[in-house]
Regions:
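A short N-terminal interaction module
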Residues: 1-51, 57-58
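Conserved hydrophobic residues forming the short capping helix/wall of the S-adenosyl-L-methionine
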Residues: 14, 109, 160, 229, ...
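Conserved AdoMet
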Residues: 34-107
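Active-site beta-alpha loop architecture of Rossmann-like, nucleotide-cofactor-dependent enzymes
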Residues: 72, 194, 244
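Conserved SAM/SAH cofactor-binding pocket of Class I
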Residues: 100-200, 224
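Conserved SAM-binding loop
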Residues: 145, 214, 238
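Mobile active-site "lid"/loop adjacent to the S-adenosyl-L-methionine
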Residues: 193-221
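Conserved Class I SAM-dependent methyltransferase catalytic core
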Residues: 217-275
Length: 282
């Protein structure tokens, strides 16, 4: 079987799953082949008529995708903010909309008053480390990031080392900021915010549920983060949120003394909030 024939067969095999994920079958088939052979896309174009070695191994990867395993888990990598991060099953896959949260956080850091010390940032729910790493790469901030998952923390440390910022980020296993101390200029988080009974597609359901579902309404963890920020005197708060949570979070932010500005994602949905603590002494 040639490379071209294998691509056509795999594209047909994964087509039903692609209808669920919204992915292009041909692109997924090529990505799987690149993973199987350890080659770049140029190799595929130059070798379409070449006999494919270990076709069985390739179709085994296609079967995993056909069974709704996310492509990122199969390839072991995900693109985010122009970089390629390591990912693995058991840790949330980066989403494009979270790049907006990174941009908003960098805006906050760039507008802080000049000090002798670098800005101090806390992240709740580090996951694969993408937010903290992007902030470290694009600012002089010192960052402390928490997560309750050992798998996530180990992966985050690997990614930090991959990009050479492991000395700028401290990863700690704890909930919220329970074991983290300091006066923070910014608290950033992309927490679980999906309502417990919200119906997700089969691909998303392969991701860790503790990183997806935020409670019965979905906004419970976000509300706790706001209270943590208030009690710790955090100057700025930046969080991703669900499309239908603006009203409930707005009232909690106001009662907690935060001046909030909500932002939308590229699809036009409410997706996050940036808030300033009017009572912070930082």
């Amino acid at each position: 079987m040639t490379v071209n024939d294998a691509l056509k067969a795999a594209s047909s095999q994964i087509a039903p799953a692609c209808e669920i994920s919204g992915a292009n079958p041909v692109r997924v088939a090529k990505a799987l082949l690149m993973r199987q052979l350890g080659v770049k896309i140029e190799w595929i174009f130059l070798n379409l008529n070449r006999e494919l070695e270990d076709a069985d191994g390739y179709f085994a990867l296609a079967k995993r995708f056909a069974n709704h395993e996310p492509l990122e888990y199969i390839t072991g990598e995900a693109g985010f903010y122009g970089l390629s991060f390591n990912v693995k099953k058991g840790v949330l896959i980066p989403r494009p909309e979270t790049e907006i949260l990174v941009e908003k956080s960098l805006e906050i850091l760039s507008n802080l008053p000049a000090r002798k010390r670098p800005p101090l940032v806390a992240e709740i729910g580090a996951g694969s480390g993408i937010i903290s790493i992007c902030l470290a790469l694009n600012s002089n901030a010192k960052i402390i990031a928490s997560d309750i998952s050992d798998d996530a923390l180990n992966l985050a440390r690997q990614n930090a080392a991959k990009f050479g910022v492991e000395d700028r980020i401290e990863f700690i296993k704890c909930a919220y900021l329970d074991q983290i101390y300091g006066q923070f200029d910014l608290l950033v988080s992309n927490p679980p915010y999906i309502a417990r009974d919200y119906e997700l597609d089969k691909f998303v359901l392969n991701e860790p549920h503790e990183a997806l579902f935020g409670g019965a309404a979905g906004d419970e963890i976000l509300k706790n983060i706001i209270l943590v920020a208030k009690n710790r005197g955090v100057k700025y708060l930046a969080c991703e949120m669900g499309y239908d949570q603006k009203a409930s979070l707005e009232s909690v932010l106001e009662l907690s003394g935060f001046e909030a500005e909500f932002y939308r994602d590229l699809a036009g949905f409410d997706r996050g909030v940036v808030a300033r603590n009017a009572f912070s002494n930082l």
